[in-house]
Amino acid sequence: MAAKIKKGALVRVVKEKLENSLEAKASDSRFPSYLFDSKGEIIEMNDEYALIRFYVPTPSVWLRLDQLEAVE
């Protein structure tokens, strides 16, 4: 799945993978609905993480690549 994901791609957050992650356990696990109900665009990447911009007035967020799926 991560092989298809590249900078500029539209992605959706996989709820099950984010909710059960170490990151979720280390912070507030009440995620806003836009994370799962809308598409985001990858604006930056490194080996394991992608910076996602959602089209709502909120800051961009870094998420692990395995927590994302490409959308058309």
From Swiss-Prot:
Subcellular compartments: Cellular thylakoid membrane
Keywords attached to this entry: Membrane, NAD, NADP, Plastoquinone, Quinone, Thylakoid, Translocase, Transport
One cellular component term from this protein's GO annotations in UniProt: plasma membrane-derived thylakoid membrane
Superkingdom of origin organism: Bacteria
Catalytic activity of the protein: a plastoquinone + NADH + (n+1) H(+)(in) = a plastoquinol + NAD(+) + n H(+)(out); a plastoquinone + NADPH + (n+1) H(+)(in) = a plastoquinol + NADP(+) + n H(+)(out)
Chief location bin: membrane
GO molecular function, one term: quinone binding
Residues spanning the membrane: none
Cystine connections: none
Bilayer topology term: Peripheral membrane protein
Pfam families on file: NdhO
Enzyme nomenclature, EC number: 7.1.1.-
Xref: HAMAP family: NDH1_NDH1O
Self-association state and partner proteins as the record states: NDH-1 can be composed of about 15 different subunits; different subcomplexes with different compositions have been identified which probably have different functions.
Function of the molecule: NDH-1 shuttles electrons from an unknown electron donor, via FMN and iron-sulfur (Fe-S) centers, to quinones in the respiratory and/or the photosynthetic chain. The immediate electron acceptor for the enzyme in this species is believed to be plastoquinone. Couples the redox reaction to proton translocation, and thus conserves the redox energy in a proton gradient. Cyanobacterial NDH-1 also plays a role in inorganic carbon-concentration.
Family of this protein: Belongs to the complex I NdhO subunit family.
Protein's name in the database: NAD(P)H-quinone oxidoreductase subunit O
